[in-house]
Amino acid sequence: MKHIILFVLMIQLSHTSTLTLKQMLDSANNNSTLTQALEQERLLLEARNLADTSSDPMELFGSAANANPLVGEDEIEYSVGLSQQFSLGNTREEEQSINRLNNEAYFLEEDKKILNFENGLKSLYHNYCLDNKYYNVSKQNYQQFVKLYKKKQKAYKYQEVSKAELMQLEIEKNRLYAQLQEIEMNQVISKQKVFVLGRINNAHTTTLSCKDIYPIRENVKLDGDRFQLSQEAHTKRLKSTQVALERHSRSLDSISLSAQYDKEIDIDRVGIGISIPLNFTSNRSEQERAAAMYESSALGFQHEQTMLEKRSRLMEYRSYLNSKARMLKTLKNNHRNYKKQLLPLIKKSYDLGETSVIEYLLNRQKSYQLRQEIYATKKAYYNTLFKLYALSEMKDK
């Protein structure tokens, strides 16, 4: 029977795989519906741009009438012709360029969603790693306490400890167990979030490495150009207004040509016509240029305000990370001293009967509270760290 169980365990282990953070991100990106949706929308807007700026179809026109001359037989007179509008210069190309630049700016803004998704997934990965570690430590702590409880149970049989003391230990054991169950549930939920958003199959046979979590740093460095996507989008929108100014600066941007054949009773006539819009009789082009200039100014002011707010939030995040990193150092030192020095003394004093069970339990709870505070501070640090990377619109280093 033991050999069968061992064989089954070996088969399960052989099918177990471990994913790193990079592999998880690759899995998410390769199966991302967000990326696919943006690609389809990109094709849609480009097709619509070409459709909206394509030349108008050639027009066929004609008419017919029954002629009743005073002399001769009745005949049918008719007229048929073709007309076509032609854009002059680069009018059509400029209109396409205006739309294309605005579309490109829009998709640069949409790329932030992908960056936000990636950073959100990184944050979930780190949360799971913290939850998993916290669960393992809490489980070990619970198991150690169970050993102590069993030891005291034996001591109670020999009347070395009181019934009240044993009951207090039992209450603490039950509390730790309930606490452990809650921590385990949080860890399971945390893992499910990562696997669902990361598009990872075989959750039961796949584990996460957690050896590649980011170090806690007081000063987070952001190399390269910050807010690059926003800057590029703003540049493209400004460029579109410049193209619009050029587009509406011409006094003549299109003409219409026509050819017509007239068949009358005793006359065949072929005519060619041209239609030229008299733009000087309308202020449309002038208003279009004014609109482009106003749009350029508005974009500049909006971008300046947006960058000001982003820089302010960036400073806020970096200050927050710095304070959390410093706090973690203090908490770890306190917990280390408490665990290595004070708690062993309390435990020894309790074993010798010099300290009450309540005092011993209170000191254990204090150690747990310090560990819990470290765990919560780390979570807050990583959540803010990836908000910082998302805000800066760049890859972290």
Question: Which residue stretches match the model-derived regions?
Answer:
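Amphipathic alpha-helical coiled-coil segments
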Residues: T35-L38, L45, N99, Y106, ...
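Acidic, low-complexity, intrinsically disordered peripheral segments
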Residues: K22, N31, N202, E373-K397
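Periplasmic alpha-helical coiled-coil/stalk elements that build and connect Gram-negative outer-membrane
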Residues: I114-R226, L314-K324, L328, S367, ...
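A small-residue-enriched
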Residues: D26-S87, D223-Q287, A390
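Sec-dependent N-terminal signal peptides
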Residues: H3-Q12
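Alpha-helical hairpins and coiled-coil heptad-repeat segments
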Residues: Y149-L166, L342-Y360
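Sec/SRP-type N-terminal targeting helices
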Residues: Q36-Q40, T53, F86-I114, A164, ...
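Bacterial Sec-pathway N-terminal export signals of envelope proteins
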Residues: H15-M58, E160-L169, G198-Q242, M307, ...
